[in-house]
Amino acid sequence: MLKIGPIELESRLILGTGKFENGDIQREAVDASETNALTFAVRRMNLYDKDLPNPLESVDLDKYITFPNTAGAKTAEEAVKIAEIARAAGMCDMIKVEIIGDDKTLLPDAIETYKACEILIERGFIVCPYIQCDVVLAKKLETLGVHAIMPLGSPIGTGLGINDALNLSYIIDAISVPVIVDAGIGSPSDAAYAMELGADAVLLNTAVSHAKDPVKMAEAMKLAVHAGFIGAAAGRIPKKYTAQASSPTEGLEFL
C-alpha cells in the first residue's frame, strides 16, 4: 500500500490523462493500467460549465483518486491559485506542484516550487512537488513538510527514461516520504528500473497515450511497476567483475 499523507493507494502506478487520441482509448487505457489515481492539469478541466467539453468525460472519476496538478504555472502565486481552484471545485486536496522555469526544457523552477509548497502546506494541502534530481532540495522540501517528492526521470515527454540514476538514488536513500518518479518514462523497462532503484511509485502519461497501442502499453506499465517493486524488495545480487559458475563442481573428477 502506497501512503501519501492520509491518501492510500493500492497501485504504485499513477497515470496522466492528457494526449490520448480519443475518450474511448483514454478510458480503456486507464482501465488496463489498474491505477487508483489520475492526474490532470487543472487549467485543462472544465470545472463549472457542464455544457462545455470535459477532457475526462469518458472516465468514471468516482472510481479514482483525483490528483490535480498546477501545470501551466510559472510562479508560486499562480500555482497556489490553481490549487485553490481545484479545492473549490471539490477535488482531492492532494496537489502536484508543477512550476516550469524554462519553456524549452520544461524543467521545474526550484525556488518558486519551494515557495508554493510552503504556502500550500500552511493551507492544509497534501503537497507533492515536481523537482529535478536534487537531493539537497528534496531534503529541504521534506523538512518543510511535503507529503511526497516527485523527481523527474528526464524532461517531460522526452521518453528518455532515467537519465540520472545516481542522483535519483541519492533522493530515494535520503528521505522518508514517498518518492514518485515523474516524467521522461518511455518504456516498461524505464518504469521497472525506477522501481528497482527504490522509488515508491511512477507517474507517467506520454509513454502510454502516444504508444502505438496505448491500452497494451498501459497494461505493460502496470506489470513493469509491479515487477520492479517486487524486485527491489527481493534484493538483486551484487555486481561483480569476475565470472562465477552457477553449476556445482562436484563430479568433475569422474569426467
Swiss-Prot record:
Cellular localisation: Cytoplasm
Keyword set for this entry? Cytoplasm, Schiff base, Thiamine biosynthesis, Transferase
Question: Which residues are involved in binding 1-deoxy-D-xylulose 5-phosphate?
Answer: 157, 183-184, 205-206
Q: Where does this protein act, in terms of pathway?
A: Cofactor biosynthesis; thiamine diphosphate biosynthesis
According to its UniProt record, which reaction does this protein catalyse? [ThiS sulfur-carrier protein]-C-terminal-Gly-aminoethanethioate + 2-iminoacetate + 1-deoxy-D-xylulose 5-phosphate = [ThiS sulfur-carrier protein]-C-terminal Gly-Gly + 2-[(2R,5Z)-2-carboxy-4-methylthiazol-5(2H)-ylidene]ethyl phosphate + 2 H2O + H(+)
Q: What is its EC number?
A: 2.8.1.10
In the record, biological process GO terms are:
thiamine diphosphate biosynthetic process
Q: Which InterPro entries match?
A: Aldolase_TIM (IPR013785), Thiazole_synthase_ThiG (IPR033983), ThiG (IPR008867)
Work out whether the entry's keyword set contains Cytoplasm: yes
Describe the protein's quaternary organization and the partners it interacts with. Answer: Homotetramer. Forms heterodimers with either ThiH or ThiS.
Q: What is this protein called?
A: Thiazole synthase
**What organism is listed for this UniProt entry?**
Macrococcus caseolyticus (strain JCSC5402)
Q: Which gene codes for it?
A: thiG
